[in-house]
Every structure is written in structure tokens, then in C-alpha cells.
Amino acid sequence: MPASVTPTPGVRAEETRTQLVRRARKINRVLAETYPDAHCELDFDNAFQLLVVTVLSAQTTDKRVNAVRPTLFAAYPTPAAMAAADRVDLETIVGPLGFFRAKTEALLKLSAALVENFDGEVPGRLDDLVTLPGVGRKTANVVLGNAFGVPGITVDTHFGRLIRRFGWTEETDPVKAEHAIGALFPKSDWTMLSHHLIWHGRRRCHAKKPACGACPVARWCPSYGAGPTDPAEAEKLVRTEGPN
């Protein structure tokens, strides 16, 4: 961000609903310009792969999940193949991700449910996806938005942190936060909004030390100053790639 940008400290408490909507959409537009290549950072070739890698991404990094993906799907390319997998063999593949026994159990149950209830196909409806073992709204929205083109908001830790820092909502419950943010944006923006905030959270708006002085949306952020505001110091905190 150019050093000449001087953020306005904070957002007035009397901000109206209309002003909030305008500010939120402005932030999203600027983030879209800042991260034109924002996308899901989990690798996948189809809806089944995306569903599986999203489940596996819990409590680990996208980078680690991407590393095991080729071996995993070479061995088990379909729900039927994965449902019939030898447990020990599957545990060996997902072992590097941590919590491998629980994750193996989750994949076996998930694949079996796809075979038994959906003829081995990943459903394209939220109500169906959340009936699958281990699949909540966050995972379902990732799959819908990125594999089916159905708009969805992904409330992960980065997204939740940023919407509160931006003063868009105080909600901490993921479902309530999803609905609160969805009301600020047209549905067509939801999926890319999720990518923009997640990318920004991974690259600049870090949990412990946000790069406030190198933030392209600092002038619209009431949390400006939570991290270093000196541009040179803040720039050192910027990651060119997501840590995951």
C-alpha cells in the first residue's frame, strides 16, 4: 500500500445500516483488486476431491493436505473405492495430517454415506451436504461455491476474525455470522467475498500481528492500529503466499 494513504482512525459508532453496507462492499472491492487471483487454496479436480480435502483440512494446513492429495486419490478415486479402503492403508496416507485415526474414520463414513444415500455422487444442495458425516455448513459452502458455482459464505477462522475487525458484525457463532454477512452483500458476491477475506487474513490481517501499515483497506477499518502502522515495519509482516 502506498505510504501516502492515511487511514481514518476508526469508524463512527453512529454508522447507519446503509453506511455499513457501503463500507463493507467498498472493502470487498478493494480486496478484489488487491487479490485478483484469490481462489480456494486446496487442490481438487472434482466435487468429491474437494469435499474430502476440505474435511481433511481441519486442524492442519492446506499445503499439507495438497501434498497427500495425489496419493490419496490415486488409490481411492471414487466414493465407492474409498468406502472399501483398508483402514490401515488409508491411515498411512493421511497420517502426515495429524489426527489420522479420526480423519480416516471420517473419510470412511463420508464415502459410505455418499454411496448409500447419493449413488456415489456429491450432492449439490446445502441441505443434502450437511447430512453427510463430518460435513457442516462451512465445508458444504466450500464445496457448493467452488465445485458447483452455488454462492456460499465460508466462515473459517480467518473470515470470522476479519468480519469482526472490520466491524461488520459482532457475531461469533458461525451460522449467525454467515447470515449477518450474507445480508450485507448480493448473493453473487458470497463465494469470492470468502476468498478475498481468507486471502487477506492469511497474508496481511494476521491473528496476532496484523500488517495495518501495509493494508489496502486500512482507511475503512475500525481496528486500524491493532498491528504496526509504520509502512516499513508492516510490510515485513506481509506474506506473498498464504501460510497454509
Language-model features and meaning:
Residues 1-4:
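Mixed-charge, low-complexity intrinsically disordered regions
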